[in-house]
């Protein structure tokens, strides 16, 4: 039986069905295929916004590539350095949940996805690519600077606002991991 969240999930409303035969290798963080990461990012951005340069979907998918190679890399520390497909840390999760739980986005998220931000718990990000993409997009939504149009500029943007000076990643790591994870192929299919 589908849960309330699954029944009200926008991708379910559009008769989207994951193709379990699409990729034979095991994915992590609840992802069935890399293509599904793009679909979740698109669904989230359809609700939250695509940004002025219409680059939010690219940024979210590239962030997932930089953080987990789009689900290919399983973090050996499931919650200490971040969790889920986009590796959101606990402090950031709590800040974003509290910031947006009474925002204009809250009723839309509840209607489209069945997500009540005020009741969301951190552990959900670990196995829900939808939740991971949502919190990734919410993190970037807090930034007043527009999302850049090029991958190189988005790499610097990711480092400054997402990975920050506390993170080990570099803009070059972002670019390299996007290539390793096959991000370009997701947008040419």
Regions found by a protein language model. Give the residues of each.
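N-terminal export signals and maturation junctions of secreted/periplasmic proteins
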Residues: 4, 9, 15-47
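Peptidoglycan-targeting cell-wall enzymes and recognition modules
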Residues: 28-43, 65-144
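Cell wall/extracellular polymer interaction/catalysis modules
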Residues: 28-30, 48-59
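Alpha-helical scaffolds flanking conserved acidic
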Residues: 54-62, 151-158
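Secretory-pathway/luminal and periplasmic proteins that interact with or process carbohydrate-rich
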Residues: 67-75, 163-172
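C-terminal/domain-terminus segments
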Residues: 147-168
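Long, charge-rich low-complexity segments
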Residues: 172-189
């Amino acid at each position: 039986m589908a849960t309330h969240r699954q029944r009200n999930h926008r991708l379910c409303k559009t008769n989207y069905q994951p193709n379990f035969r699409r990729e034979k290798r095991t994915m992590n963080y609840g992802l069935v295929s890399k293509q599904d990461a793009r679909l979740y990012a698109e669904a989230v951005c359809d609700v939250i916004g695509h940004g002025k340069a219409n680059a939010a979907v690219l940024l979210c998918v590239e962030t997932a590539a930089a953080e987990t190679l789009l689900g290919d890399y399983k973090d050996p520390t499931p919650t200490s350095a971040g969790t889920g497909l986009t590796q959101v840390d606990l402090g950031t999760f709590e800040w974003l949940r509290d910031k947006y739980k009474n925002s204009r986005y809250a009723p839309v998220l509840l209607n489209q996805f069945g997500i009540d931000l005020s009741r969301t718990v951190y552990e959900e990000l670990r196995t829900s690519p939808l939740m991971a993409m949502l919190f990734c997009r919410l993190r970037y939504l807090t930034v007043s600077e527009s999302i850049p149009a090029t991958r190189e500029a988005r790499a610097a943007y990711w480092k400054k606002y997402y990975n920050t000076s506390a993170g080990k990643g570099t803009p070059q790591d972002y670019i390299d991991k996007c290539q390793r994870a096959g991000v370009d192929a997701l947008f040419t299919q």
